């Protein structure tokens, strides 16, 4: 079941550069503004871009919350150590300790009231599970990206399927969004005339989708070609990553995989080298 969104009044506030939104009125007529790149952004694509941006924002907030709490807890603990070492009759020293504790408490409260509250909307990812054909999911995702961004970028998208009639009981729309984002990212990171390949397979326990592409880091920031992902997201994707972490813009893929009891992995991305994006989903919900 595909989630409905208001197509007659859809507003996309985080606009991808070099693309335009084509809105559809209640009568079915389309309107839009052609971008300089010559690419129009359909409402579905705008919706997918907005979803990717939303999950990226929440992923960044999660990192901020996690990475700040450790130092704040350490500061709080060391404040108690200092208090025992300082002269209890020294007003200046006591004011300093109170100020340190107060500052830490304010920062923790800020994380709780702003960061954690902002993330609440996507903290629990609800799934609409229905049986569907895996082969159709993959082929539809490939066609969507192939006829959209890939064609305008001169990138070919191939589909290598090891599937036949396999069915899966899951949230098709969420998984389609994850596959779209994986393919779109691979196209964004590919040079003209490059090839992106989606290989799918399944066994008795799980199904897999592995996207392979040759990374061209300069393509992520090339102003002469169209882009769907935000400039900030593409710039961050080029930065070195700590082990086990993914590019922020791929957060939706990770969340969707985990909600289905599976995993998402991003391979190392080095200029001119083959790189992979992999989705692994168990056939039976965890």
Give each language-model segment a name.
Residues 83-91:
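Short acidic helix/loop segment immediately C-terminal to the autophosphorylated histidine
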Residues 102-107:
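Short alpha-helical segment of the dimerization/phosphotransfer core of two-component systems
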Residues 122-127, 167-170:
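Conserved micro-motifs of the catalytic ATP-binding
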Residues 128-132, 156-166:
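Conserved catalytic submotifs in the C-terminal HATPase_c
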Residues 220-233:
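Short conserved segment of the HATPase_c
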Residues 261-269:
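Glycine-rich ATP-binding loops of the HATPase_c
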């Amino acid at each position: 079941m595909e989630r409905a969104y208001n197509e007659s009044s859809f507003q996309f506030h985080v606009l991808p550069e070099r693309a335009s939104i084509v809105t559809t009125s209640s009568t079915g007529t389309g309107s839009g503004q052609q971008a300089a790149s010559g690419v129009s952004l359909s409402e579905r694509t705008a919706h997918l871009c907005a979803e990717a941006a939303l999950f990226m924002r929440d992923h960044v907030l999660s990192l901020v919350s996690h990475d700040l709490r450790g130092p704040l807890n350490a500061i709080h603990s060391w404040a108690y150590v200092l208090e025992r070492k300082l002269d209890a009759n020294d007003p200046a020293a006591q004011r300093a300790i109170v100020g340190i504790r107060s500052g830490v408490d304010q920062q923790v409260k800020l994380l709780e009231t702003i960061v954690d509250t902002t993330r609440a909307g996507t903290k629990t990812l609800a799934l609409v599970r229905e049986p569907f054909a895996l082969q159709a999911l993959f082929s539809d995702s490939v066609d969507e990206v192939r006829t959209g961004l890939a064609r305008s970028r001169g990138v070919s998208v191939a589909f290598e399927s090891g599937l036949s009639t396999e069915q899966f009981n899951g949230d098709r729309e969420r998984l389609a969004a994850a596959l779209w984002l994986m393919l779109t990212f691979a196209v964004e990171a590919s040079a003209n005339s490059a090839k992106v390949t989606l290989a799918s397979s399944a066994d008795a326990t799980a199904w897999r989708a592995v996207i392979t592409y040759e990374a061209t880091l300069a393509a992520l920031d090339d102003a002469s070609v169209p882009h769907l992902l935000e400039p900030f997201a593409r710039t961050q994707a080029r930065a070195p990553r700590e082990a086990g972490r993914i590019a922020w813009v791929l957060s939706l893929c990770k969340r969707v995989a985990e909600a289905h009891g599976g995993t998402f992995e991003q391979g190392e991305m080095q200029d001119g080298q083959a790189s992979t994006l992999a989705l692994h989903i168990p056939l039976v919900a965890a």
